[in-house]
Amino acid sequence: MAHENVWFSHPRRFGKGSRQCRVCSSHTGLVRKYDLNICRQCFREKANDIGFHKYR
């Protein structure tokens, strides 16, 4: 078995490795609330477009 066949061959069904950002495909800092699945950096950029507003 070559390294390419073994690398990432284990199925990722749950845990941090199974989810990624819709925008940038990052695995870190995901906002999963309301089924957004966007990392916090992309959320700050796209929040107004999605419909979130800061009231402060």
Swiss-Prot record:
Subunit text: Component of the small ribosomal subunit (SSU). Mature yeast ribosomes consist of a small (40S) and a large (60S) subunit. The 40S small subunit contains 1 molecule of ribosomal RNA (18S rRNA) and 33 different proteins (encoded by 57 genes). The large 60S subunit contains 3 rRNA molecules (25S, 5.8S and 5S rRNA) and 46 different proteins (encoded by 81 genes).
NCBIfam families cross-referenced by the UniProt entry: PRK05766.1 (NF004424)
Protein name listed in UniProt: Small ribosomal subunit protein uS14B
Organism name: Saccharomyces cerevisiae (strain ATCC 204508 / S288c) (Baker's yeast)
Cofactor or coenzyme needed: Zn(2+)
Sorted UniProt keywords: Cytoplasm, Metal-binding, Phosphoprotein, Ribonucleoprotein, Ribosomal protein, Zinc
Note: Present with 5410 molecules/cell in log phase SD medium. There are 2 genes for uS14 in yeast.
Described function: Component of the ribosome, a large ribonucleoprotein complex responsible for the synthesis of proteins in the cell. The small ribosomal subunit (SSU) binds messenger RNAs (mRNAs) and translates the encoded message by selecting cognate aminoacyl-transfer RNA (tRNA) molecules. The large subunit (LSU) contains the ribosomal catalytic site termed the peptidyl transferase center (PTC), which catalyzes the formation of peptide bonds, thereby polymerizing the amino acids delivered by tRNAs into a polypeptide chain.
Family note: Belongs to the universal ribosomal protein uS14 family.
Top-level taxonomy: Eukaryota, Fungi, Dikarya, Ascomycota, Saccharomycotina
Residues that coordinate or bind Zn(2+): C21, C24, C39, C42
Main subcellular localisation: cytoplasm
Signal peptide segment: none
Subcellular locations according to the entry: Cytoplasm
Database matches in InterPro entries: Ribosomal_uS14 (IPR001209), Ribosomal_uS14_CS (IPR018271), RIbosomal_uS14_euk_arc (IPR039744), Ribosomal_uS14_sf (IPR043140)
GO CC annotations on file: cytosol; cytosolic small ribosomal subunit
Molecular-function annotations in GO: structural constituent of ribosome; zinc ion binding
Domain of life per record: Eukaryota
Residue positions, PTM Phosphoserine: S25
